Amino acid sequence: MKKKNQKLQDIIGIACGVLLLVIMAVCIISSNTTKTVGDTNVSAEAQTLTGTAQGRNGPVEVEVVADAERIYQISVLNHEETEGLGTVAVEKLPPAIYENQSLAVDAIAGATITSEAIKEAVIAALESGGLDPSVFQNEVAAAAPVDKTDVELECDVVVVGAGGAGLTASVFATQQGQQVILLEKMPFVGGNSLRAEGGMNAADTKVEAELGITDSTVDNFVEDTLRLGHNRADPALVRTMAENSAEAVDWLFSIDAPLTKVVATGGTQHKYLHKPENGEPVGEYLVEKLKVQAEQLGIDVRVNTKATEILMEDGQAVGVKAEDDEHNYIIHAKSVVLTTGGFGANFELMASYDPSLANAVTTNHSGATGDGIAMAQAVGADTVDMDQIQLHPTVIQQDGTLVSESVRSHGAVIVNTEGKRFVNDLAGRDVVSQAELKQPDGYCFIIFDQHLYDEVELTHKFVERGFTITGETYEELAQNMGLQGDAVQNFVDTMNTWNESVAKYKADGTPDAEWGRDNGMDDDLSTAPFYAIKIAPGIHHTMGGIKINSNAEVIDTAGNVIPGLFAAGETTGGIHGGNRVGGNAVCDFIVFGRIAGKSAATFADNVALPNAA
């Protein structure tokens, strides 16, 4: 009888497991499809067609119902685009194409690659049925001017910019009991934080202690950050970031955003970089967790809403003016937090500091134009380090896709077209970038193996998007990379030498003999197949911005605090100096986002709404 019962329990368990898998599969499919938009009545000549094009993260497949003269229906069947970024284009572009009967509609701001992929997939679908896509390229009429409605709103804290810093500040201020309005000019939240791939640096954390890492102290973190920033950063801000980093990691655990893996990052002497357990890109991971918190806390998040001016009264920030397509807003607030990001997509502004950057590739999203900096300057705020603009050494030039330090932290190396390493691959970003710019042909390759691919999830998208070159042997990979003559054997020798260096390092801590590398050497690159990605430097981070103090209070040009005005994240300057350390941007926006949220909440607790009777 016991055996029968056990057998029955086993069958039920298996059935439940299968049912769970089916439900999960349905959920996964559902999350990557969109509802069909268009007519329910179609012509007798209409065909149901499918087409595919490459998006940012993978293939985008669409289904189109059309005849020679009209598109009746469009739906996106499958995609792998980033939630809250590419998915905005997936949601909004098919209706726009249908309503205008045109593929000449504007791309969705900040999601250009996904937008173009949807258009190309529709073209492929039409062509597969023998239909002429040029019929659907008619010019789209400009939208008629709208008489905007004037609206006044009130809140305790208004936060401008819904990237990582803005979301963090909003959540933290709300946790302190404040009513928050969060504004975002783009059609999605997350900003550049969605593009952060590596991790968050932090010192003296519980995670490090559990992993037996004892030398990643606050003092070492401060020293590494100042040294790699060429001692231009404000030591007080750097120490504030380091001293508050462990508590910030604890807070992330408390909001169901644990970072449980720790590795080294470029140029540092110790392991500080905290990552999600499965190796997924840290930015998407944290933004999604912060969005959930914002929703659960009932924060008033308004996308497609651009702040245009800080309202001042008797020298104090008392709100902002903002606008969307239909409204002009005056938002009265007890305190204002600026978290609008840097200006890495404002080529005119960057070129005013460095003309060589006018035509450079950028890893930044299109909304990173420095709006908050300009608004702050308009009310007397000072700025710092505006001419310090960072190049990242491993950028795919086709579209500005970043290959994070995390890949090198797990053992990848960089070689030139002669098949040789030419720098400590994990030196500071500026050092590696400048070394690359001196190499023949103007580009290099980052190399990794199957073991690293299996360990680091973010490498999968490079394969899926067709950015990788592969080979079953070092020689085959070199040939597929287009290396010529002696460069092929040079590459084979380089890889063998590297693997020997890793073995020595693991045995007794001996640094890499060629270039002195002494971190990111836990595993060699010996597991076939082997991968290469063609890369070169690209604009990545603007270190300069609004001047703040350790309370995230904005400082004016006379050196005084502007009451009621706070700032955090890449819109500020003084934290990274002349070169930002990989992993410090995330630390910056979480730590100073929390500080700005707390400071704004404390200020709000002690003042009345300016327009209150």
List the model feature ranges, each with a label:
Residues Q179, F188, N192-D300, N304-K306, ...:
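Conserved N-terminal/central alpha/beta ligand/cofactor-binding core
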Residues I373-M375, A381-D486:
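An anion/pyrophosphate-binding glycine-rich loop and adjacent beta-alpha core
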Residues E309, N490-N579:
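A glycine-rich dinucleotide-binding beta-alpha-beta segment and adjacent secondary-structure elements
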Residues E152-C155, D325-S335, V561-I562:
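Core beta-strand elements of the Rossmann-like FAD/NAD(P) dinucleotide-binding domain
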Residues D324, I331-I396, F592-I595:
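Glycine-rich loop(s) and the adjacent beta-strand/alpha-helix scaffold that form part
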Residues N278-K334, I373, Q377-V379:
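Helical element adjacent to the flavin cofactor pocket in flavoenzyme catalytic cores
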Residues V146-A165, I181:
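Beta1/beta-strand and adjacent pyrophosphate-binding region of the FAD-binding site
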Residues V37-A141:
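Active-site- and interface-proximal helix/loop "cap" or "latch" segments in soluble metabolic
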